[in-house]
Amino acid sequence: MADSIAANFIRQSLIYPQEKLYVQTDKAAYISGEDIWFRAHLTDALSHIPDTTSRYVYAELLNPADSLLKRVKIKPANGVYQGYMPTDEDIPAGEYQLRCYTKYMQNMGEDYFFRRKVTIGDPLSALYRTHTDFEYTEDKKKVNIKIYFTEIESGKTILPENIMISESDGDLKKHKIKEDSCIYLSRKAPADKKSRVLYISYDYQKKFHKQYIPIPYPHNEFDVAFMPEGGNLPAGIHSRIGFKAINANGTAEDITGIVVNEKGDTLTYFESKHLGMGSLTTFSLPGQKFFAICRNKNNVEKRFPLPASTANTVSLQAYWLRNQLNIALAKSEDITSLNSDYYLVVHCRGNVLYSEKWNNSKDFITFRKEELPTGVIQAVLADAQMNPVSERLVFNINENDLTKVSYSTARQQYKKRENIENRVSVTDNAGNPLKGDFSISVTNSNDILPDSTVNILSSILLASDLKGNIESPASYFRGDLTNAHPGLDLLMMTQGWRRYNIGRILKGDPESPAIMPETSQTISGIVKGGLLMTKPAAEYPVNILATNFPFVASGVTNKDGRFAMTGFETPDSVRFIIQGNNKKGGSRVELLLDIDTFPQIRRSAPLSLSGIDGFEKYMQKADEKFMIDNGMRMIYLKEVEIVAKPKIKVGKLPYSSPMNRLFTSEDIEKTHAHDMYSLLGRMGGIWVSGTRITMRNAEPLILVDNMEMNNTELHMILPEHVDEIEIFSSSSAFFYFGQRATNGAIVITTKKGNMGIPGKEPFNIKTITPLGYQPLREFYSPKYETAEQRNDATPDLRTTIYWNPTIKTADDGTATFSFYSADTSAAYSVVIEGMTSDGKVIYTTGKIEVK
């Protein structure tokens, strides 16, 4: 039986290997218009060996309402996935997220994607501050909002003009400041994340500012989940119960509490020890009821029932004793001896470490720390039919799995604009050199500190193997890694393992992936022939031509009329002409292309972020650098002559309104969208899944050049043929278009006025611009090799001093590189993250002094 269990795990890993993804960025916060530089580390989920089986990694920038703004596609160059995410100059200030994944990861769902929070500000965020006070009514059905504005330097109240604020349905409404210099709103308590974000824009002293502000949950809302160790609570014995308290925002809530019985007698006291987590010990008999009375820091008290104990129950218990892990089988007091067989399976990431029938003569089984690998270890107790009956997670750190990474510079201190020589050494625990590669970020600590809430250690070894959101995972990996953080065991008691379905593996019923790894670009579709062009046409020729890239291909359809061109890849913005013909070369066929689909965006758990203290000073400096590199910003309306202010746009249609949202051809060009579906999906408030388009969960009216169009027909229009798009809310759409527009309207005006289809494209020809890979671009780091360069009067105001995602160690485990310091005296923060070729994590931090 033990051999078959191990064989089942091996079979599962071969049929369905999984991936892990971690993404490092050059810094934690940006100013509008800056590029977000990143490196993606893609590994095999079991071995952690770097893996490029998936040819592409997708990176998306999501706004605070979880709507897509940009998407880029990265391919490996010399085994390295590196790229950048451009941000628009006029992007609203707020808390954004990077969402990164491969197509193959969609098999496991969005929980397996990597997300990272980034803060984006605009220059006016350094000058003016928007203050918001939120107060919920007693029944929590409404929230009253007070808004006012101040100048940061003086603290004085300011009175902006043309203030636009988003309504609950996403529409913008103009507001005026009251006599007390405030704006007052009252609205229904937000039901979802999209309506839990305020969008505010205004003018002040001929400057234009816009930002997102989250609407918090009520302060007195919190919940506590209680989880018995091993998942069961055997009656008549002392058992541990782990608990986790979170507030309505989804983040940790520190609590204290007591356990009481049905009579109200106090039995024990407990308190959270780390990020809302803790444990308590109980003793109960069948039928007894116990309750936890919990109190948070706001003195809000709540009562929760504790899990009930049951007779004839077994459960796993685990505890560390020095460097020894003991796994015990706890039995309810009515079980004097086990009458049925149980099997204990212990594995780490699917690699079976132990699988044996439980020996009834033993109270516990012991594992030495050095025998276990580093990472999340799952112990599973299964019955004779291989049904899991109890589970316990533990976390182990094995010194032999860790790398020793040393970072040093040639000198302890450097001057401005001086060459800084760096050396990195990577060895195993015994001092043997290791080959690998890593990315390095060097930032000015006076401007911004590195994000300390997540790193490659915490992601690869911990968070990627656990269910649910792990708040501030890097907090478990500070200091001496050989001594586990005391909060780790609490985390193991309150989270679940999230990779394979263990029950199916134990029974020899492995899962299989529905989506295979993406190995190349693909253009696919179907050709239909016959009298009415409705029947799948077998063995019909299909030809593909790239108009702005050297690529041609041809093939024939299969018996179902389908075709798929693979084995090629092109950079972004390449246009293809695809033509289908009948066997005689005639054009009387209809060609239908498959539309590239991307995973939906669902509400995410709140992500932690640190290092953005003093962000306002940083933005002033970053803005000055931006203008040195790019010229005057468009938001500075006072210094440049602009006839039409960007704050209120009115379309060209006779029924256009400034209350609608308008996207001009210039706006559309900035999105770099490849088809109408991806274009509309990047417009806030519009949801696109395949060809289905919804606004507030209902399908809107779609008009193209004043003609109603089905959403499935939008593939005929290219974004570059669109002159403007105007989004009507349900109320304004109903006024102009009647009953058919009760769900709102999307009004598209093309440049040629013929539905954007030049000369009416034939049925057998389609033109598309699919998402291609992002061409490589190198981070610019200036050199000061000559006296002329060193004396250049142009200030060097870099906030990211150096970014290099492609550093590899030599055979001796070392790597050297250099860069020049900037013009500011400061301590530089260094972050190094990567993987060795045999699957060990490379991570260290350092400092550089510049005087």
Give the residues covered by each predicted segment.
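Short strand-turn-strand beta-turns centered on an Asx-Gly dipeptide
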Residues: 168-169, 262, 703-706
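Surface-exposed, low-complexity/disordered segments
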Residues: 12-16, 27, 31, 52, ...
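Periplasmic plug
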Residues: 691-731, 755-764
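Ligand-binding face of N-terminal immunoglobulin V-set domains in extracellular IgSF glycoproteins
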Residues: 81-87
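Short, acidic Ser/Thr/Gly-rich low-complexity loop/linker segments typical of extracellular
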Residues: 73-76, 174-180, 268-274, 552-560, ...
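Contiguous segments within soluble domain cores/interaction surfaces
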Residues: 2-19, 24, 29-31, 35-75, ...
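Extended, solvent-exposed regions of the mature portions of secreted/cell-surface glycoproteins
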Residues: 62, 342-355, 385-388, 392
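Beta-strand signatures of extracellular beta-sandwich domains
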Residues: 58-62, 164-166, 256-260, 343-345, ...
